[in-house]
Structure formats: C-alpha cells, structure tokens
Amino acid sequence: MPRVVITAEVNDLGTWERGFRTHGDLFKQMGVARMEYATVTGNWVAVCGETTDLDAYMKIFNSPATAEVMAIDGVKPETVRMFVLDKSLDV
C-alpha cells in the first residue's frame, strides 16, 4: 500500500489537532484506516497514512472540500508538502 506523508505549517497546533481528529470520514474516503501524526514547535505538523487507493486519495486531497477543512483547521496552504513514499532501503 502506498504511504503518504504530508507536512504543513498551521496557525495554532491545538486548533489544528482538534479539527484533524474530526476528519475520520474524510480519511476513510481516501482509503486510509489509520493516520499517524506529529507536531513540533513552530506550528509544524506531519501526517502519515497508508492508502488502499492512491488515486482516490489524491482526488479527495485536491478537492474543494479538503481545502475547506484545511482552512478551518488553520493550515497555511502555501506550506503544504506531500510525499508519496515510493523507495525503500533494506538494512
């Protein structure tokens, strides 16, 4: 399953996290069963999830509905970066 990592700067970590925790239905539509995330000083967040359908994930991520909830959560859109992990290193 493809693993996707998204990083972004937000206006307020508490506001973002409260909003993020309410978006379970949206994540399910993206083919994600579990989202892992971290926050750091400076109001930066990182979100990671595995999806069963990368096309659906991308379609929903790029939708106006997702842009709306990200704005409500205080995500600064110009800082959003997405990484689809497609390489690995066996050690």
Indicate residue ranges for each PLM-predicted region.
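Short S/T/G/P-rich N-terminal loop/turn motif that feeds into the first structured element of a domain
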Residues: M1-V91
